[in-house]
C-alpha cells in the first residue's frame, strides 16, 4: 500500500478546488502490481483479457506489424461478471499513440455481440438515430495524444457533441479498467468503432450496405469499403466544383453540424486527417466525428471560417489541401447553404450548446468516475507524473475551452 505526501503550490488562480481535490488523495491505494479485478467495484466496465502471454508480449514489441491474437474476454460491472470467457480477437491500434507503454487495443467478437442491457458499453446519452444493440468490435483506447495529460479529453469532447443533440455520427465511450491475464494494465477508454463494422451496427444495417472512406494526414484519401466508384465520383465532383451534384450527394444538415463542431473546438488535427465519411446504399454521404485529442490546443483565437480555410497544426503557410476544406468552400459560395450554415452556427452559440459550463460539468463527471483509481494507474505509468499534475492538466482543459468560448463570443455575431 502507498500513501501520497502532498506538497504543492497554486499557479495563478486556476487551482480553485485544491481542498476538494486534496480530500480525495488522503487514502491508501493499492500498488499496480498488487491490484486485483475485485478491487474495482465500478459501474463502468472492468475488463480482464486472457491471452497467451508470450504472444501478447511479442505483439506489444512488434506493434506495427498488425498482429492479431485470439483471446478471451471477461467483463465486470459492480463486481458482477456479465461476460464470461467470450472469444475475441485483439490487435494493437493507433499510430503515434502505439509507441506508448500502454497501447490501444482493438477487440473484435467472434460473432456479433448482442449488447443487451448495454453490457459492453452504456453511454449516458444516445443520439436518437443511433443503435448500440449489436456490437461487433470495440476499442480499448489509451486516450491517444491525451495519454500523457488527462485520459479524459476525447471522451469529454465527444460527450459535448452528444449532449448538444447534433446531427452527427460518432463513437460512444465509457472509462474502463483493463487487466491482461489478471495483471493490471491501466485505465483506458472503451470506445465503439467508427469503421465499417461500427457504423453498420450504429445504423442497424448490414456491413455490405456501407460505403466508407478515410482521409489521413496529409490529406490522403483511403477507400475502405463499399462502392469505390461512388467515392471517386464524389471526390471528382469536389475537384470539378460540381455544386448541384455535391448538394445531392451529402447530408447537408450533418455536414453543417460536423463542420460547426470541429471549428468551434478548434480541432487542428482535422480535416486533413481524422476524417471518415460513409453512405448507406444510395443515401447521401455522412461524416463521422472521432479522435478529438488535439481540440483547443492551437488557433483558439481564429474565426471559424479562417480556421476551416487554413487546416494545419502549424502556421497558415503550411495549410494542407484536403477534400473537406474544398467541399466546404464550394458549398459556402451557395447562398442557400451559406444561410443555413450561418444561422445554425449562430443558433448553437446563442443557445449555449457548447458553453464552458456544460463542458466543465461533463469533464468533472468523467474526472470523478476515475479519480479513485488514478493513483494505481500512475503507479504503473509515470507519463502524467503525479495526481496534482493530472488535476492541473484537467484545469488546463477547462481554461483552454473557456478561452475558445470567449474568442467565439468576442467575434459574435459571427456572420
Tell me the role of every PLM-derived stretch.
Residues 35-40, 128-131:
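Short boundary motifs at domain starts and secondary-structure transition points
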Residues 1-4, 19:
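Positively charged n-region of N-terminal signal peptides that target proteins for export
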Residues 5-6, 26, 401:
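Intrinsically disordered, low-complexity segments enriched in glycine/proline and serine/threonine
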Residues 4-12:
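Sec-dependent N-terminal signal peptides
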Residues 15-37:
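Bacterial Sec-dependent N-terminal signal peptides
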Residues 11-17, 57:
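N-terminal processing/targeting junctions
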Residues 42-50, 54-66, 71-73, 78-96, ...:
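Middle-to-C-terminal accessory/interaction subdomains
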Residues 65-221:
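Conserved ATP-binding subdomain of kinase catalytic cores across diverse folds
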